[in-house]
């Protein structure tokens, strides 16, 4: 894995992003989270999202943003990739986004949206930020990462209302580490009737349902997950659903849980003012039902 990672880094010519610091403040003590927030509020207006008792709809996205959104800049192109990513997520009103190739841009994107943000750390991209992350309109309460797969998977438990929680898991593969991730999350997969699971990302493989040989797609379907796009559009020839500029459907969103109904899924590959990635954005809208029977209620 180490040699493969170094080879990939060299081939893709990934280097630290060229960011400029406006101001630097130094404290002679460790400041707490409230002090951090108060300092941040001076520069950006933010409002905490108030949780409702029950949420009836949830919009989820999956997006590989291509090297942290560094390929278009104001100086060179007249527009900034990262701000375009923010613009699209905001326009689509997404509640949760599973991001890949986040690198040093994840916290920036989350801050611009006023969202919660979680990522991992890994040796290969320690100077650029980690590969995968999750941003969420709603509070992130728990983080799970399997040993030796920080580059491939991060799972977060999110409180989407006062009575509901979901697991959101962002992924990027080479298939070698998929079995480790799958086994690590088995208990969470089994408990999806109580806490639904969204498992999506860049699998770098075409699903078996589309004529590909992805071991991940087969395993996920066997586990009871639903492929959001292919389930809604079963005709592969009529609706190929490509998620990459080379006409491949290598990004997918799988979901599992009794209280979930996928009411709409689309793949966004263009944008009027310019599209910022070589991977396309998957957007799915879910209707949520909550009852004692389906287990989505966490109220004590």
Which role does the model predict for each range below?
Residues 1-23:
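Extracellular glycan-interaction patches encoded by glycine-rich segments
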Residues 96, 114-121, 144, 149:
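Short phosphate/oxyanion-binding micro-motifs
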Residues 117-132:
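A short, structured active-site edge motif that brings together acidic residues
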Residues 102-107:
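Acidic helix-start/capping segments at beta-turn-to-alpha-helix junctions
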């Amino acid at each position: 894995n180490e040699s493969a990672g170094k080879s990939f880094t060299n081939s893709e010519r990934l280097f630290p992003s060229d960011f400029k610091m406006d101001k630097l403040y130094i404290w002679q003590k460790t400041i707490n989270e409230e002090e951090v927030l108060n300092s941040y509020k001076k520069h950006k207006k933010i409002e905490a999202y108030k949780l409702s008792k029950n949420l009836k709809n949830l919009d989820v996205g999956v997006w590989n943003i291509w090297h942290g959104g560094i390929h278009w800049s104001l100086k060179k192109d007249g527009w900034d990739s990262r701000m375009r990513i923010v613009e699209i997520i905001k326009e689509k009103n997404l509640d949760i986004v599973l991001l890949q190739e986040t690198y040093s841009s994840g916290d920036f994107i989350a801050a611009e949206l006023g969202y919660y943000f979680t990522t991992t750390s890994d040796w290969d991209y320690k100077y650029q930020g980690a590969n995968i992350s999750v941003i969420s309109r709603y509070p992130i309460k728990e983080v799970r990462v399997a040993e030796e797969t920080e580059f491939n998977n991060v799972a977060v438990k999110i409180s989407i209302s006062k009575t509901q929680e979901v697991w959101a898991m962002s992924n990027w593969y080479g298939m070698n580490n998929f079995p480790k991730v799958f086994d690590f999350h088995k208990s969470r997969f089994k408990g999806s009737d109580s806490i639904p699971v969204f498992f999506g990302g860049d699998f770098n493989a075409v699903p078996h349902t589309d004529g590909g040989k992805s071991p991940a797609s087969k395993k996920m379907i066997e586990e009871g997950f639903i492929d959001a796009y292919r389930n809604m559009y079963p005709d592969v020839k009529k609706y190929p659903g490509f998620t990459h500029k080379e006409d491949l459907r290598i990004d997918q969103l799988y979901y599992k849980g009794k209280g979930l109904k996928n009411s709409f899924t689309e793949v966004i590959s263009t944008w009027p003012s310019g599209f910022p990635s070589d991977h396309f954005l998957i957007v799915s809208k879910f209707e949520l039902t909550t009852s004692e029977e389906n287990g989505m209620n966490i109220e004590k």
